[in-house]
Amino acid sequence: MKIRVPATSANLGPGFDSMGIAVSKYLEVDILEERDQWFIEHDLGDIPNDDSNLLIQTALRLAPNIPAHRLKMTSDIPLARGLGSSSSVIVAGIELANQLGHLNLTDDRKLAIATRIEGHPDNVAPAIFGQLVIASQIGKDVDYIIAPFPDLSLVCFIPDYELKTSDSRDVLPKQLSYKQAVAASSVANLAIAALLTGNLKKAGRAIENDQFHEIYRQRLVREFQPIKRAAAANGAYATYLSGAGPAIMVMCPNKKKMAIYEAIEQLGLIGQLVSLELDRQGLCLV
């Protein structure tokens, strides 16, 4: 049995901590034979291969009596880059407990558990459901909408350095004034409405006019402004920080994808430039 969870790109500008899409990079976990102690085969560097791994910790949190197994974990989701690496592991851990513990969890229950562990639903929701998910957490309650995503292309630049979410949150203001909050939420409302109605030019303007986090975080990602300028000059709808960064996502018309890809490539930045697709399936068994 194999568990597969997609990478995610959260926020989409002003949808701070509440909106995200699933994209075509994946964490996969093969559930192999039972053994006396947990063991994870992987080639992912300094990640633990025993029961101190977040994957197994998450599973045991839900089902402490499930038998230990040998697991094989593979992933092309880069760590601490703003593509939901920790969320994918949490969601996979929940499904591991669900399968081995025969918990029969609904997707809604998986989302509630994942949100409680992660702290907000913007990554874990699209990791579970795929597509574009807009979610709200008030207390313990998590409400969400799985929404159609426009037909467009995604080009992502992944810098070769990590940016931990905790460090990225440290640059945010502790509070916004009432006037600032109203302005920021109006931009978010417009971005969502424009995405859902297919008005991608207005969606792009709203995404790039985020007032919640990107205006504070972009100075941590030196590649952001050069990529944003190059993408805009070649017809992109919007450029935004994926999650807490440092990954940078460009939304563009399908016919402009190659021109934008080449323009970013010509900047000579150090990192990985990839073309991504929307993942429509989310968490699944394969």
From Swiss-Prot:
EC number: 2.7.1.39
Pfam families to which the protein is assigned, alphabetical: GHMP_kinases_C (PF08544), GHMP_kinases_N (PF00288)
Top-rank taxon, per record: Bacteria
Molecular function terms, GO-annotated: ATP binding; homoserine kinase activity
Localization in the cell: Cytoplasm
GO BP of this protein: threonine biosynthetic process
Cross-referenced InterPro entries: GHMP_kinase_C_dom, GHMP_kinase_C_sf, GHMP_kinase_N_dom, GHMP_knse_ATP-bd_CS, Homoserine_kinase, Ribosomal_Su5_D2-typ_SF, Ribsml_uS5_D2-typ_fold_subgr
Pathway of action: Amino-acid biosynthesis; L-threonine biosynthesis; L-threonine from L-aspartate: step 4/5
Binding of ATP, residues: P78, L79, A80, R81, G82, L83, G84, S85, S86, S87, S88
Enzyme category, top tier: transferase
Any GO CC annotation of this UniProt entry: cytoplasm
Signal peptide: none
SUPFAM superfamilies named in the record: GHMP Kinase, C-terminal domain (SSF55060), Ribosomal protein S5 domain 2-like (SSF54211)
Keyword field: Amino-acid biosynthesis, ATP-binding, Cytoplasm, Kinase, Nucleotide-binding, Threonine biosynthesis, Transferase
Reactions that this protein is recorded to catalyse: L-homoserine + ATP = O-phospho-L-homoserine + ADP + H(+)
Sequence similarity: Belongs to the GHMP kinase family. Homoserine kinase subfamily.
Biological role: Catalyzes the ATP-dependent phosphorylation of L-homoserine to L-homoserine phosphate.
Name of the protein in question: Homoserine kinase
Provenance organism: Streptococcus equi subsp. equi (strain 4047)
